[in-house]
C-alpha cells in the first residue's frame, strides 16, 4: 500500500464484533491488532480479520468516515459497506456472506 494514502478500515473480531479505525498502512495495522499491540478493544478479541477498507486523500476525510461509521447501528454499518462495495474509494470489501 502507498504510504501517502489514508484509510478508514473495519476489522471483524473473533467474537464477531467489528472494530473501525484509521491508518495509513493497512497491512501493518491489521498485523498490529493481531499481535495484541493495537487497540484495547481488539487486544482481547483476537484474531481480527479485515472486512472493509476505504481510501481517502487526507487523514481528515478518513477520520470523518470513521467517526460517521461508529455512530451507525450494526445494520446500517452493513448497509454502508454494501453501498460502498463498488465505489472507487473501496480498496477492500469482504463478500456479503462473509461479513
Swiss-Prot record:
<comment type="similarity">
    <text>Belongs to the UPF0213 family.</text>
</comment>
<dbReference type="InterPro" id="IPR050190">
    <property type="entry name" value="UPF0213_domain"/>
</dbReference>
<protein>
    <recommendedName>
        <fullName>UPF0213 protein YazA</fullName>
    </recommendedName>
</protein>
<dbReference type="InterPro" id="IPR000305">
    <property type="entry name" value="GIY-YIG_endonuc"/>
</dbReference>
<dbReference type="InterPro" id="IPR035901">
    <property type="entry name" value="GIY-YIG_endonuc_sf"/>
</dbReference>
<feature type="domain" description="GIY-YIG">
    <location>
        <begin position="4"/>
        <end position="79"/>
    </location>
</feature>
<dbReference type="Pfam" id="PF01541">
    <property type="entry name" value="GIY-YIG"/>
</dbReference>
Amino acid at each position: 500500500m502507498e504510504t501517502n494514502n489514508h484509510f478508514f478500515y473495519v476489522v471483524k473480531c473473533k467474537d464477531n464484533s467489528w472494530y473501525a479505525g484509521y491508518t495509513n498502512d493497512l497491512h501493518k495495522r491489521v498485523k498490529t491488532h493481531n499481535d495484541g499491540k493495537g487497540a484495547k478493544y481488539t487486544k482481547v478479541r483476537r484474531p481480527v480479520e479485515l472486512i472493509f477498507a476505504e481510501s481517502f486523500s487526507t487523514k481528515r476525510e478518513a477520520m470523518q468516515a470513521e467517526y460517521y461509521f461508529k455512530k451507525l447501528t450494526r445494520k446500517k454499518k452493513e448497509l454502508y459497506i454494501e453501498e460502498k462495495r463498488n465505489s472507487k474509494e473501496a480498496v477492500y470489501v469482504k463478500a456479503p456472506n462473509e461479513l
